[in-house]
């Protein structure tokens, strides 16, 4: 109890003194501000997507949280993931459908604030009209497996 109160007191003091916006007190406590996320290309997705891994890594059997940023007019062909993924739309509109081939007429438009829970090995596809940011979390190892191997950008 004392260590919890001491950590809370330290947190409040640092917050009042203008401590950096992103920091971790321990392995179980972390805060991340959007402007301090580090974005990188995503080799398993078509060019243009960016990822910021907040918790992970995605390749291990541990909890993961990541943000993905997609440009306007972006498409991801039909693919599936080996684990359940919880998707929250942070901004923009995330158009998602299930099936073996991308068909924009068979999607549901999820606006900011929406949630999708993708079951393992369920083929699905996505596209955007405008820049869209989603947050994905689950327990790894995660990955992207394309229904049509020719769609996999890692093989091009």
Model region roles, listed by residue range:
Residues 1-5:
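Positively charged n-region of N-terminal signal peptides that target proteins for export
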Residues 22-64, 149-156:
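A short, N-terminal "cap"/entry segment at the start of jelly-roll beta-barrel domains
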Residues 28-31, 105, 125-156:
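Double-stranded beta-helix
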Residues 59, 94, 100-121:
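Short acidic-glycine-tyrosine-enriched beta hairpin
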Residues 61-81, 110, 119-120:
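Conserved short histidine dyad/triad with adjacent acidic residue
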Residues 76-78, 96-97, 118, 123-129:
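Short beta-strand His + acidic residue motifs that chelate non-heme Fe in jelly-roll/DSBH
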